[in-house]
């Protein structure tokens, strides 16, 4: 075969392959059109099929694109029933770890929000960690000066419990430098306080939509719980403070249904001080253990009935649970009056167990370090000093901070009582450490039928970060 014949032969074969390839593409297009046409989708290539199962578990969302199926499982609650929450609190012999977010450790290299005041609240299908961001990330220049409590950049956001407060999974809830949140069985309600100190406003969101507001009535830093509010049979309750942090202030209980205020009452508490209440449902009422920033090292106790009548006093136990505080041996306790003459304080909690009380406190008497929870026999009703159990959660070599309460609803736990749970904030950075920022992580514990060994589930981040060395 001479050279010209070789060229002609190669050219013919190449042309044949090109024609064959074109025919294959034409056939592929025809088959695709015919197949999609028979599907009855009027020529639309993309469609989303949502199948709702009556299991109140999830929605199965199937996105179909040509011959590719993507299945995404979306948490779902039928939204048709309010949680009861009138059950009694379960009796707890100890507290087991529920979650730990390790946010600051991860934040040395991850995209983690600078936060304070984390807290946990639960719906019938999940628990979420809420937190107040500073509108900045760890190890970033905007984290400078975040020791400040109130700024226009602070927002309430949330993640599923156990997740770090990261930018990829966090959900926006409200603009806020003080907040509370709870679920009534149908939707989440959040209360976010923001604005200037003298004219702050609390915006109530229900199902993610603003539904009502509370304006500052005393003109002195309107603020709320920094922990879960409480919903009973569809109505949700929370406590607000307006006035000085170190002398007599004004206190109110609010009641809302579907995010709209349906009742409020002023709390008469002359000589006493209430703020940052940690509340939970118990036997059809709301029980709160609060912070006295004025004089008491014992904690105020507030019990709220559905008709907004209330009883207010102090935790009777003859052992103090606020910080700073004096020696246990020098404290006598009182059910009605502040004791100890130590101001400032820190947010804390307690759980009634019949006439006993579980109460959390820092291990240090003078600083926010270490954390333990004590069960005091008859401590809810008497000035008893009898400790019948003690459990260490953070050792005294490590920083702690705020702490607060919440419960697992029976829909979530499967029990016939409300499981008592608490969280402990572990503050890092300023003012105790040489950084430009202040942030925190948290450990969450829930009540169990067994005693649990002491251990230290501390924050564990190695400081300073790179940004602190610049």
From Swiss-Prot:
By what name is this protein known? Neuraminidase
Quaternary assembly? Homotetramer.
Tell me which residues bind substrate. Answer: 116, 150, 275-276, 291, 368
Task: Give me the Intravirion side stretches, as residue ranges.
Answer: 1-14
Which Pfam family would be a valid example here? Neur
Instruction: Tell me more from the record.
Output: The influenza A genome consist of 8 RNA segments. Genetic variation of hemagglutinin and/or neuraminidase genes results in the emergence of new influenza strains. The mechanism of variation can be the result of point mutations or the result of genetic reassortment between segments of two different strains.
- Please summarize the record's notes on activators and inhibitors of this protein: Inhibited by the neuraminidase inhibitors zanamivir (Relenza) and oseltamivir (Tamiflu). These drugs interfere with the release of progeny virus from infected cells and are effective against all influenza strains. Resistance to neuraminidase inhibitors is quite rare.
Specify the glycosylation sites in chain numbering. Answer: 46, 54, 84, 144, 398
General function of this protein: Catalyzes the removal of terminal sialic acid residues from viral and cellular glycoconjugates. Cleaves off the terminal sialic acids on the glycosylated HA during virus budding to facilitate virus release. Additionally helps virus spread through the circulation by further removing sialic acids from the cell surface. These cleavages prevent self-aggregation and ensure the efficient spread of the progeny virus from cell to cell. Otherwise, infection would be limited to one round of replication.
Required co-factors:
Ca(2+)
- Give the transmembrane ranges: 15-35
Question: What do the Gene Ontology cellular component annotations say?
Answer: host cell plasma membrane; membrane; virion membrane
The protein's organism comes out as Influenza A virus (strain A/Duck/Ukraine/1/1963 H3N8)
Active-site annotation: 149, 402
What is recorded about the protein's domains?
Intact N-terminus is essential for virion morphogenesis. Possesses two apical sorting signals, one in the ectodomain, which is likely to be a glycan, and the other in the transmembrane domain. The transmembrane domain also plays a role in lipid raft association.
* Description of post-translational modifications: N-glycosylated.
């Amino acid at each position: 075969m001479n050279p010209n014949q070789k060229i002609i032969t190669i050219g013919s074969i190449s042309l044949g392959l090109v024609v064959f390839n074109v025919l294959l593409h034409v056939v592929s297009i025809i088959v695709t059109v015919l197949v999609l046409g028979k599907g009855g989708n009027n020529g639309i290539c993309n469609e989303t099929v949502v199948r709702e199962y009556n299991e109140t578990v999830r929605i199965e969302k199937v996105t179909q694109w040509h011959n590719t199926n993507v299945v995404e499982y979306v948490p779902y609650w039928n939204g048709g029933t309010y949680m009861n929450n009138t059950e009694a609190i379960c009796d707890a012999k100890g507290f087991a770890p529920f979650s730990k977010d390790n946010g600051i450790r991860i934040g040395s290299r991850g995209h983690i929000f600078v936060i304070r005041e984390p807290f946990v609240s639960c719906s019938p299908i999940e628990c979420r960690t809420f937190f107040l961001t500073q509108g900045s990330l760890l190890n970033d220049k905007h984290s400078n000066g975040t020791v400040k409590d109130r700024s226009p950049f602070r927002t309430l956001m949330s993640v599923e419990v156990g997740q770090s407060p990261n930018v990829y999974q966090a959900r926006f809830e409200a603009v806020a430098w003080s907040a509370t949140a709870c679920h009534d069985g149908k939707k989440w309600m959040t209360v976010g306080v923001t604005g200037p100190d003298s004219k702050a406003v609390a915006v109530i969101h229900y199902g993610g939509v603003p539904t009502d507001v509370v304006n500052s009535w005393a003109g002195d830093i309107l603020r709320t719980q920094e922990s879960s509010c409480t919903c009973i049979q569809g109505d949700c309750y929370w406590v607000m403070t307006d006035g000085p942090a170190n002398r007599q202030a004004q206190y109110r209980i609010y009641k809302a249904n579907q995010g709209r205020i349906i009742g409020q009452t002023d709390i008469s508490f002359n000589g006493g001080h209430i703020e940052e209440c940690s509340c939970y449902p118990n036997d059809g009422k709301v029980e709160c253990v609060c912070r006295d920033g004025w004089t008491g090292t014992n904690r105020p106790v507030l019990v709220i009935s559905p008709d907004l009548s209330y009883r207010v006093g102090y935790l009777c136990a003859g052992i103090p649970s606020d910080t700073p505080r004096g020696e246990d041996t020098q404290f006598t306790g009182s059910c009605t009056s502040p004791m100890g003459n130590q101001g400032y304080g820190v947010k804390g909690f307690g759980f009634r167990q019949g006439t006993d009380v579980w109460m959390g406190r820092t291990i240090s008497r003078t600083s926010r370090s270490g954390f333990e929870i004590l069960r005091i026999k008859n401590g809810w009703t008497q000035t008893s000093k009898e400790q019948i159990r003690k459990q260490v959660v953070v050792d005294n070599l490590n920083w702690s901070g705020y702490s607060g309460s919440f419960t697992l609803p029976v829909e979530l736990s499967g029990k016939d009582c409300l499981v008592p749970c608490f969280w402990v904030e572990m503050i890092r950075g300023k003012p105790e450490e040489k950084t430009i920022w202040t942030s925190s992580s948290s450990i969450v514990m829930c009540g169990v039928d067994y005693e649990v060994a002491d251990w230290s589930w501390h924050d564990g981040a190695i400081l300073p970060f790179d940004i602190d060395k610049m």
